[in-house]
Amino acid sequence: MEEDGSDWGGLAPEILINIISRLTIQELWTGPMFVQKSWLTVCRDPYLWSIFDLEPWFDSYPESTHLWSPEFEQKVDLMLRSVVDWSEGGLTKIRVRHCSDHALSYAADRCPNLQVLAIRSSPNVTDASMTKIAFRCRSLKELDISYCHEISHDTLVMIGRNCPNLRILKRNLMDWSSRHIGSVPTEYLDACPQDGDTEADAIGKHMINLEHLEIQFSRLSVKGLASICEGCPKLEYLDLFGCVHLSSRDITSNVSRLKWLKEVKKPDVYVPRSGDVAQTERYGHWRLYDERFDIQAMRI
């Protein structure tokens, strides 16, 4: 291949698309788009943009306050809006972080076939854009709104009422602040939602078809857990890690009614870092419970 890429320049667009489709998002975004104009045109083909997944990049990048800056959010927004345009309405999966209401509303207006939406750690996504998602993306099957503090139980109600195909919900919260200091803004850590039972009630009343639920570090009580177990009879997986207001007895007595349940992730024991005595006392009550969940034994 010549340095200017001319040997590839004569390839039919469908062949180029086939080749480029094998690249990761990061490879595509930093490579072929800058080879020549014809390649840029091919890289914008709707066929390549039914899925927009930045999770592999975020997983490989160390958490830092830079990711929470307005400048970084603008970059993510620009990428998301561009992909929405290139998909020509065919986008079915979005997995990003640190986006805003503006970009998400833009996607909601133009991607009615969206089935998977993951926007964890997006401090400027609110109920406003999520309401648009609820009304305009009714085919939604999976939703991850973990660490999104400006999203309230109102979103859970609207999604539950308007997206009957929802099977997976991830609403995990951040754990004890000491593990995030230095990488997450302090004011954001302090604003972590406290209304666990209200959110649990919304889930139980409006998400009857849920099969997979993650609510790590929720502040829900046994009342909230009862609402979920009563209202979501199809649950197969329930993640309660870090939900320290629930005892082993609370969990066992409530999940026993879930006949399809395959796995429960219990609050577990917190293993503190050196010198973190206060946290040991807070989470140490789980040391009283060393029995393991036996789902089969709970069934009649």
Swiss-Prot record:
GO terms for biological process: protein ubiquitination. GO terms for cellular component: nucleus; SCF ubiquitin ligase complex. The keyword Ribonucleoprotein does not apply. Residues 11-52 form the F-box domain. Part of a SCF (ASK-cullin-F-box) protein ligase complex. Interacts with SKP1A/ASK1 and SKP1B/ASK2. This is F-box protein SKIP1. It is found in: Nucleus. Pfam families: LRR_6. It comes from the Eukaryota. Pathway: Protein modification; protein ubiquitination. The F-box is necessary for the interaction with ASK proteins. It comes from Arabidopsis thaliana (Mouse-ear cress).
